[in-house]
Structures are given as C-alpha cells and as structure tokens.
C-alpha cells in the first residue's frame, strides 16, 4: 500500500496520512469549549470517532505530541488523558508549551492541540519499555520512539543539553540502540536567544552524521 491522504482540507492538511504501517494525525483542537479540561475531553472524544472511522485502536498509539498554551496546566490534561488511553499500552510522547494557532471556524480560545502516531499493522509487535502512566520508549516495525527527556539539575542550556544527551547514552545502551542510528531529534527550548549553547554538546555527541530535526522555542 502506498501513501494515503485522507480527509484532505482545501489549502490545508490531511486529517490523517497512512504510510508504512503508520497513521499520522494532524493536531486536533476544541476551542468551542472554554476550559482546558473541557477541551481535552472534546479532543479525545473526537479521536474516539476518528479511530472508529479509520479502524484504529488506542492500544496501538505509539507517540503523542501535545502543545499547550501553558504547559504548567499539564496535570489538568493528564488526568483525563491517562484515563482515556489504554493503561496497559501507554504511548511515548512530549507535552510542551507551544501557542497553538488562535483562530479556527469554531473558536479562537485554543488552549491545547493534540496529535498521534498510531500503528496500523496488528501483526507487528509493539514493545513498550519503562511503563508507568506513560512509557519511556516504544519500539515498532524497526523504529524506536522516545518520550522527551529533560535535565533540570544544572542551570545553563548547554549543560542541560549535555545532561540530556548523556542520559540518552545510558538509555541507548540499556535498550541496545546506537546514537549513529538516530533519524530525527526535536528540541524544545525555553528561550531561542540561547540557541547557540546547543551546538557544542550536540555536535560533540552526534559528530559528522547528525539527525534531521527541529529546534523551536516552546
């Protein structure tokens, strides 16, 4: 099967794209509701409908990306989210402060946006490691998906980046992975003015074969 683009909006995005045993969802929001709790409930209800429409399972969610207007409010979302997902098969993922676009046909008060990567081939095993409410890493079809890691024990961005990468060294050894095989690395930093501090530890870690990725202020 080739790439399938479904529910394509004119001049916009596909609602979901299927490719290589994966489904990639566009981020969904629910600004018609006022509170973060109500928006989270509305988004997850919509995903229930979409999973049914496209024949997907919550137990096959591999990775979650959540952008929140204020990630300090994460607990309000997390309580609802962890009741919604399959508790035996939690995904990896990240939740960061990132201001979602503030206009839509149904309202301008967008407090969060949520997207998923979902496995589509039930014959392929999904392995989840270090499972608590979420999980540290998910392995599926030859790919590993890591939850975002932080290192707040030190003060500067450069020191924190070095600490995070050192932690990944430990995790790669634990899970039998190689940093040379990292395909994409996304970084979310508090202040883009300090972007230059990333280069030294990042280059020292990856050398001549760095991954693709993005660094954004979030």
Regions found by a protein language model. Give the residues of each.
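N-terminal presequence-like segments and the immediate start of the first folded domain
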Residues: 1-63, 67-166, 170-183, 188-218
């Amino acid at each position: 099967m080739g790439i399938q683009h479904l529910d394509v909006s004119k001049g916009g995005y596909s609602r979901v794209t299927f490719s290589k045993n994966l489904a990639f969802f566009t981020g969904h929001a629910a600004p018609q509701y006022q509170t973060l709790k109500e928006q989270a409930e509305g988004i997850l209800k919509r995903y229930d409908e979409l999973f049914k429409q496209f024949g997907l399972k919550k137990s096959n969610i591999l990775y979650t990306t959540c952008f929140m207007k204020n990630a300090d409010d994460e607990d309000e979302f997390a309580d609802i989210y962890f009741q919604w997902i399959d508790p035996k098969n939690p995904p990896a993922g990240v939740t960061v402060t990132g201001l979602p676009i503030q206009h839509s046909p149904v309202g301008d008060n967008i407090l969060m946006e949520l997207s998923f990567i979902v496995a589509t081939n039930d014959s392929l095993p999904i392995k989840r490691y270090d499972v608590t409410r979420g999980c540290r890493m998910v392995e599926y079809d030859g790919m590993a998906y890591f939850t975002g890691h932080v290192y707040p024990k030190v003060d500067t961005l450069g020191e924190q980046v070095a600490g995070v990468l050192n932690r990944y060294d430990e995790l790669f050894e634990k899970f039998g992975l190689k940093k040379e095989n990292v395909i994409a690395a996304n970084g979310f930093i508090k202040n883009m003015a300090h972007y230059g501090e990333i280069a030294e530890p990042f280059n020292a870690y990856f050398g001549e074969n760095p991954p693709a990725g993005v660094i954004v202020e979030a």
